[in-house]
Amino acid sequence: MAGHSKWANTKHRKAAQDAKRGKIFTKIIRELVTAARLGGGDPGSNPRLRAAIDKALSNNMTRDTLNRAIARGVGGDEDANMETIIYEGYGPGGTAVMVECLSDNRNRTVAEVRHAFSKCGGNLGTDGSVAYLFSKKGVISFEAGDEDTIMEAALEAGAEDVVTYDDGAIDVYTAWEEMGAVRDALEAAGLKADNAEVSMIPSTKADMDAETAPKLLRLIDMLEDCDDVQEVYHNGEISDEVAATL
């Protein structure tokens, strides 16, 4: 929300949704398998796999579990028909929404995604309708830390930008392919991040009011509940004042 990192917002919103943890792990494993199948099992030469590993570790997945997933992908398995599909649409209040899916059945997936949009006052758009509003970036997040120290180390490691929020949280932005290398450099400097993920960063924000904010959150929850949906990105901005009413 305003003055807070996207990761902090998501973390606090999901804190009461521990029942979804198993589903989150399932989605991460699916991404690990697919990334390894498409680009090989070496994260050093497979940025998509490295990003998936970083996400797995940020969600406290064990090395044994993620290594088994990578081995499945390299060896080929029942997930061989999985493909990445991106859906674009508009949510409440004109919010731009991108939905990243991994699916073996396009018809099933698009039906579920379309249903979520229609139930929450939005509509599914055509390819390219909102994608131009987003840029794919690596985001390395710190709940707190010394801004100058993190900024100096991050920029020296090749980061593109460092943003500090009102609550003291810090986000380091990188080219998505370079996120793993920048995170390694930060850790080598003694700066351990709380989260690292590849995200779609919006170039503009859509302010949500007391009426549209709960509808947007419901849309996000409905989309995330779809088994085929891996990630949901949007440009909705919820102020602290509006958040306090939710």
UniProtKB/Swiss-Prot annotation:
Q: Which UniProt keywords apply?
A: Cytoplasm, DNA-binding, Transcription, Transcription regulation
Q: Where is the major localization of this protein? A: cytoplasm
Kindly list the biological process annotations in GO that this record carries: regulation of DNA-templated transcription
Q: Name one GO molecular function term.
A: DNA binding
- What Pfam families does this protein map onto? TACO1_YebC_N (PF20772), Transcrip_reg (PF01709)
Locations listed in the record: Cytoplasm
Q: Which domain of life is it from?
A: Bacteria
Q: Which family does it belong to?
A: Belongs to the TACO1 family.
Q: What is this protein called?
A: Probable transcriptional regulatory protein ESA_01378
Organism of provenance: Cronobacter sakazakii (strain ATCC BAA-894) (Enterobacter sakazakii)
* Organism phylogeny: Bacteria, Pseudomonadati, Pseudomonadota, Gammaproteobacteria, Enterobacterales
